[in-house]
Amino acid sequence: MELKGSKTEKNLMEAFAGESQARNKYTYFASKAKKDGYEQIAAIFQETADNEKEHAKMWFKLLQGGEVKSTLENLKAAAEGENYEWTDMYDRMEKEAKEEGFDHIAYLFTEVGKIEKEHEERYKKLIENIDNGLVFSRDGDRIWKCRNCGHIVIGKSAPEICPVCSHPKAYFEIKAENY
């Protein structure tokens, strides 16, 4: 049987959306319960949010043919999704909110749309970095920082293994200072 176009596919999409929304909502509820002094209730909300995340992941995998795609494919899908959000979705929502007199909400849709555009550009740059072999290696020396222990290495490439904590190259990034 073909899942594409079936009622079951539609149900999987609804289940994924519902579980994803519930996870976020319960995370917000956990934060509020913690602020209100209810540690146990916060923990229960957080545990439930974690359960909902796993449910969403299960439905997502079924929609994707049983697996989460490669990082490069995921970056491309993410860039495409962000493009839709800023070029179509938020643009339409901004116009509709204005027509209905919700000027502040229209403004928020516009501003979030600008953020989504930045997200798309960031994903496209990461795609370019993977395609050009620039994630862990650059022309000229760079300051590489281990995200696990904070060890600093200066060179054209991140080390294969962190000499301090033994974590793999995957934990290194170019050190950014914005302070």
Q: Can you name each region flagged by the protein language model?
A:
Residues 1-179:
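Non-heme di-metal
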